[in-house]
A protein has these predicted regions:
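C-terminal helical subdomain
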Residues: 45, 61-93, 100-102
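Short C-terminal tail/terminal secondary-structure segment
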Residues: 94-122
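A short hydrophobic alpha-helix cap/turn motif
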Residues: 36-38, 51, 86
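Active-site helix of classical SDR
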Residues: 21, 29
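Short, flexible catalytic-loop segment of classical short-chain dehydrogenase/reductase
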Residues: 8, 43-57, 100
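Alpha-helical segment proximal to the catalytic Tyr-Lys
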Residues: 34-35, 91
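Residue(s) in the substrate-gating loop at a strand-loop-helix junction
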Residues: 4
């Protein structure tokens, strides 16, 4: 399953429905892993962060440059992890959500006004 860091790990204003859906996907993945592990079936999710795609907005691409890696990820980097999780080499990996975000979640947000308290516009 492809989930997202938004929802299971982080959130943003206005993303309640999206975050709930992605968080729900991870809960479903863990249940599938638990119920089917005895049959040799694994279930995992991949949680991409800032990935440069054709649908990325300029702001999303800029945000990707603020990761510790210093750039947005690529679809091929996400696909590589998916290929590994689908391979026999990952046969003992199940029930996990693996983050692919260039280390973005390990840093504290700086300069982010989460509560829009800038009174200079009034």
């Amino acid at each position: 399953m492809v989930s997202s860091v938004t929802g299971p790990y982080v959130t943003a204003p206005g993303s309640a429905a999206y975050a709930a859906a992605k968080g729900g996907m991870d809960g479903m993945m863990r249940t599938i892993a638990f119920e089917n592990g005895r049959f040799g079936i694994t279930a995992n999710s991949v949680a991409p962060g800032w990935i440069a795609t054709h649908s990325s907005t300029p702001d999303e691409l800029t945000a990707g440059h603020h990761t510790p890696i210093g750039r947005p990820g690529t679809p091929d980097e996400v696909a590589g992890l998916i290929a590994y999780l689908a391979s026999e080499s990952a046969s003992y990996v199940t029930g996990q959500s693996v983050v692919v975000d260039g280390g973005n979640m390990i840093q504290e947000p700086h300069g982010v006004d989460l509560y829009d308290t800038d009174d200079s516009a009034t």
